[in-house]
């Protein structure tokens, strides 16, 4: 449904009261999209320091005496976005810039998949002011790909695959990334024997495995081998009944669709305040209709729609380093057939659960004070996620006063 009924009587409390102090702020009068499918009209959200203390309908939330009160009538609040497939910079200064840029566009956490190495994994432990949280697959695993990056482990046997997993595990990566793709016939791809060994070893080590893939037949083999997540949907053809049945038999399997560019010219005006004139001009130059891209998008859009109809667990990912990319991806997911409400759940609660971030993904008591203040309702039009009035990260306003690039 494009509009979810409001839960006017719902109140989510962390204890019976919140002590009043200068750090307590009550945001009042906005529509609150919880992130789990519920909506509260005319809500009150009380933030104490970096945490949400209360969230519920106006009149049902007890605002502590002395709390600062912010009138957000006419606005919509939604949780900050979780991007489960990025490729962030490998230099520390650039990585920190990437994480700040994501917060600017309303992203609270990003998973970088397999091209990072191990040198910057310490950044994951840092709560950087005004910056998204960092998650990483460290070094991914693939067959040798001469001419491409050497950041992943190159393996040619099951034993080498297991050894690569062991090294990832020793560095405590968040997930193991594998590539199963010939890159248009240029390379050999991981065989079922090798990726099966990788998945088995990872599971022994308490790690999950996410796969880059292209072909339907590889997707079937990966599901049978107990893969945990797909970093893309099937891209070579429409999925069939056998694949749908396999997916249904593995209800914990997670899909990050990473839809490609739709190949149609779009309005980029919303990006202008965040970019220098030079960077904006580069985007505009590339903003053209592309019939080939339209056909490629069509295959993946149909496959996403079919899996979504089965109740598949879907999260959001962008497969790149564009900090505004999640807003484009959400639009593409709706064009593919998901409702705005479904897309928001995928981009918030589902993403947080996939990355195992216990205090993110929904606007509920006890969660981190991470939310986007929007000028319009994204349940009516998903592109309204771009109409950002303010971003609050861990209870503090993110500086959006100047261009990022």
Language model features by range: what are they?
Residues 204, 291-377:
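His/Asp/Glu-enriched, well-ordered alpha-helical/loop segment
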Residues 223-230, 249-254, 311, 338-339:
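Glycine-enriched alpha-helix->loop->beta-strand junction motifs that scaffold or abut catalytic
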Residues 347-349, 353, 368-405:
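C-terminal cap of metal-dependent C-N hydrolases
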Residues 6-16:
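Bacterial N-terminal signal peptides
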Residues 92-94, 189, 219-226, 261-277, ...:
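Histidine/acidic-residue-rich catalytic or RNA/ligand-binding cores of hydrolases
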Residues 32, 36-78:
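Histidine-rich, glycine-flanked metal-binding segment
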Residues 72, 76-84, 94-209, 242-283:
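Divalent-metal coordination cores built from histidine and acidic residues
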